[in-house]
Amino acid sequence: YDGLDGIEDGIVSNIYAARANRDNFLKQITEKYGLTKAQLKTIDVYENGYTLDYAMANGMNAYHGYSALEGGAMDLGPDPVPREPLDTTYNVHHGDRADGVFKYFITKDPNWVLIDHDYYHPDQELYDMLMAASEEYDANSPEFDDFIANNGKLIYFAGWNDMSMSPWQLIQQYRGYVEKYGQEKVDSFCKFYVMPGVTHTKGIAMNYLSWLDVWCSTGEYPTETLYATMSATGGQMPMAEFPGWVKYEGGDPMDGASYSISTEIPDGFWGVYD
């Protein structure tokens, strides 16, 4: 996948082409490592997410997967036996956080054993607790009327390799803003960037506070090309505003001017691979 963006530099920038070829990659690693059905099922959840037969209080019933087959690093832990309480040192990454959320936020029961329950088919007690928690802690509302009325400005950001907060889920949320307000209105208060080689808060250095300050102070977003420094190479890349991706055009790969923002996306991508 690395060369699909024009340069092999350890950063998968053309995430769309990579994702469209993921089945071939999955076949290769399955044959190479002899992946079991259980392992493939786990990869499928990481890559494609999951859908519930019921909806949360806000109407959501699905969570999009990550870029697990396009450069994302999955940490499933060295211990195949879940501990109680779950321990990220030995069990799946973020397992202890999910365990704590259920123990202390959702069920209010410190003796709750996370893996002892079926969340796809919850009993009435668990269902009621999920509904109550989803209403109390919901942070997915596309409602920005007050924010817009007060001239609020938002730089919305996702990393393609973030395995803690799915970039595809954030894209879905951004689309909710566009569906509600229209693209022109959203552009007036929100700039959405998705960058390659970026995990959860790591992989990039960018001066977004200065950009936001200019926008809020002058009412105009910076018009010049904005660059970020990539941790993987130490070089610069231009900020890719969604749905664009960073394409190498030639020249010094450390120089941000050697790249462009491409909107070339495989035909039929949306609705199939997102």
Each model region followed by its residue ranges:
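C-terminal His-loop and adjacent cap/lid subdomain of alpha/beta-hydrolase
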Residues: 1-274
